[in-house]
């Protein structure tokens, strides 16, 4: 009972860690694609998932998410909680496998490491199939082991045959479910097959020929059935990959790939110095090696027969070696067909529990030999995990921040503005968060190589007052930034924001106006030779002094200026905009940009009576204390000297 209580506690710990700051990150593009497919009818999900043409992932995870959303809704917290729950459940088979292939201590340590592993926590908090598939695979492998080790008939389990059948069912459902969630999980089927063969051979050597053959035949049937169930899916994947993937060299760059995996599966996200990364790689490799080499001394009573349990502890090392290295070997072979097999550590998420199992064995073996060394090693591993966990939610590690991008556009866009999303498919995450009335356009669906491809769609945006260009994933489809260049060559830049993975820029397509817009407070204050500040508006009247998402460390206050001239100004001037306190001390200064209005349309070219629209961002001192501040604007000559009086544009409340 104590063991089950401990495992339950580890599960609750894992769940708590995975629910912690669950919505700190915005959903990024891949996650919103999960929601897109999960929002389709189930029949459509399976049609697409079995052919792997429109989407490259199988249908099971999307189907589970479809049902989950039907029960709990589609908020960020709701859709991410499914992955958190499934990720936390991985602790249960990890503890069980560590126990069966080692001892109670190694099982407990393996479960603890799975609970706190930063890589597993990160992907448990993502609306994708990588962590759920890893959990399903763990349950499948655990079911295979337990089908061999079902207890003898007792008052607590009077029907061992039925129980054994249940474990075989778990093995089948786990392995098939893993592949139907994520294709690379198929790399574990050879692992299961070799486990079956090794266990059969060992039982034969133990003189249990009848039990060995019964186990082998049942296992062979289960694995054959699993293979038959996933064969159509694997054939579809093979057929599709042949036409789309680029071949590489078999086992090319394996050393670099393994080093990258070791760093990712221990530290995952920075900031880490090069020394810390190398130390983590060496430490992970050393612990893995110790887990493979050091035998555990003795076994506590397990509740199973001595003949059954006495050899599984000895087989733990070779079985775990197969679990870890065979998928890597298969991946190395498949590099000849697809050179991107090892491009992303997440592709092999299902291997992280194998590392945790080996690390748990290594720590248990060290503790048995030199107890102090075992405690020190455990403390070091936990310290690395905990520090790495704290890094998951740092601003520099944010996923694509579509929530922040959409919120900024929504709160700052005018009634006659337009939003241009580029490239076209990233409209899906943007529109998830954008609730403004402005139209959203996404005309560019192909790679852009010629400026002639850009102009016709963009000419249609000229009737709008300004165009918000929201860009992401442009490296492949617009490597020369043709869309942005077309806008920048013609219109002033009003603002630029840089949420993680995204660029937001506002271009003023109508910056020469016949009159002051009705929603702008009128000032009519003289600021320089023949120049009047007709109106001014402060868009961010309440703000903290710092910003962690769009342009850390300082917050920006956006200010709109509307100038008017009664006669042609004698020279070119620049606008000065500052934030000052009651004593006149400066706490914020405007940012100067090459493409701002007074450079695109300098004052010496102004026509009498026209209104010239200019927008600037005031960069705040990040240590600005909370309180009331004023935004003051004026003009300066080419030498930076003021040419008139400053005018109060509005007030800003700086808050904590």
Model features per residue range: what roles?
Residues 6-149, 164-513:
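Membrane-proximal helix-loop-helix interfaces that form the catalytic/acceptor-binding platform
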Residues 32, 59, 105, 119, ...:
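Intrinsic disorder/low-complexity detector
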Residues 150-157:
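Arg/Gly-rich low-complexity intrinsically disordered repeat tracts
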Residues 407-416, 425-428, 440-656:
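C-terminal luminal/periplasmic domains and tails of membrane-associated envelope-modifying transferases
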């Amino acid at each position: 009972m104590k063991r089950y209580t401990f495992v339950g506690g580890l599960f609750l710990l894992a769940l708590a860690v995975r629910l912690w700051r669950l919505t700190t990150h915005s959903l990024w593009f891949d996650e919103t694609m999960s929601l897109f497919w999960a929002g389709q009818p189930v029949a459509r999900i399976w049609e697409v998932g079995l052919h792997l043409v429109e989407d490259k992932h199988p249908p099971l995870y999307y189907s589970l998410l479809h049902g989950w959303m039907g029960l709990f809704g589609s908020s960020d917290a709701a859709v991410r909680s499914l992955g958190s729950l499934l990720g936390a459940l991985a602790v249960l088979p990890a503890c069980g496998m560590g126990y069966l292939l080692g001892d109670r201590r190694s099982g407990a340590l393996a479960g603890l490491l799975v609970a706190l592993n930063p890589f597993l926590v990160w992907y448990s908090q993502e609306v994708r199939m990588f962590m759920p598939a890893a959990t399903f695979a763990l349950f499948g492998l655990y079911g295979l082991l337990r089908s061999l080790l079902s207890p003898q008939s007792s008052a607590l389990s009077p029907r061992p045959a039925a129980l054994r059948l249940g474990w075989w069912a778990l093995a089948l459902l786990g392995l098939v479910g893993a592949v139907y969630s994520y294709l690379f999980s198929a790399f574990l089927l050879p692992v299961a097959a070799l486990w079956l063969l090794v266990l059969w051979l060992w039982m034969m050597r133990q003189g249990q020929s009848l039990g060995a053959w019964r186990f082998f035949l049942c296992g062979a049937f289960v694995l054959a059935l699993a293979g038959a169930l996933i064969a159509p899916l694997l054939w579809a994947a093979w057929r599709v990959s042949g036409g789309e993937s680029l071949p590489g060299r078999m086992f090319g760059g394996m050393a670099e790939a393994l080093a990258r995996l070791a760093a990712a599966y221990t530290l995952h996200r920075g900031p880490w110095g090069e020394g810390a990364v190398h130390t983590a790689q060496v430490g992970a490799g050393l612990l893995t090696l110790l887990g493979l080499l050091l035998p555990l001394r003795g076994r506590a009573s397990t509740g199973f027969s001595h003949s059954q349990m006495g050899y599984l502890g000895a087989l733990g090392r070779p079985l775990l070696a197969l679990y870890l290295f065979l998928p890597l070997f298969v991946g190395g072979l498949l590099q000849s067909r697809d050179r991107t097999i090892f491009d992303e550590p997440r592709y092999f998420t299902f291997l992280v529990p194998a590392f945790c199992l080996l690390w748990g064995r290594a720590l248990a073996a060290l503790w048995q030999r030199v107890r102090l060394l075992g405690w020190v090693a455990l403390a070091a591993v936990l310290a690395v995990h905990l520090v790495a966990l704290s890094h998951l939610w740092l601003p520099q590690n944010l996923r694509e921040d579509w929530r922040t991008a959409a919120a900024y556009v929504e709160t700052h866009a005018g009634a006659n503005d337009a939003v241009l999303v580029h490239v076209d498919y990233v409209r899906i995450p943007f529109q998830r968060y954008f609730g403004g009335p402005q139209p959203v356009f996404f005309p560019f669906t192909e790679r852009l190589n010629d400026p002639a491809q850009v102009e016709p769609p963009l000419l249609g945006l000229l009737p709008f007052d300004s165009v918000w260009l929201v860009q992401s994933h442009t490296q492949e489809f617009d490597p020369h930034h043709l869309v942005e260049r077309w806008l920048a060559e013609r219109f002033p830049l009003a603002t630029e924001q840089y949420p993680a993975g995204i660029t937001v820029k506002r271009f003023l397509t109508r910056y020469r106006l016949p009159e002051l817009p009705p929603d702008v407070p009128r000032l009519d204050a003289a600021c320089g030779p023949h120049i009047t500040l007709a109106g001014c508006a402060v868009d961010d009247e309440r703000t903290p002094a710092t910003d962690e998402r769009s342009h850390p460390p300082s917050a920006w206050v956006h200010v709109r200026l509307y100038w008017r001239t009664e006669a042609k100004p004698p020279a070119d001037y620049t606008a000065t905009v500052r934030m000052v306190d009651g004593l006149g001390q400066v706490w914020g200064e405007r940012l100067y940009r090459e493409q701002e209005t007074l450079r695109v349309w300098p004052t010496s070219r102004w026509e009498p009576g026209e209104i010239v629209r200019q927008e600037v961002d005031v960069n705040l001192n990040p240590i600005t204390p909370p309180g009331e501040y004023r935004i003051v604007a004026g003009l300066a000559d080419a030498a930076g000297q003021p040419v008139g009086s400053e005018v109060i544009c509005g007030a800003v409340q700086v808050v904590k």
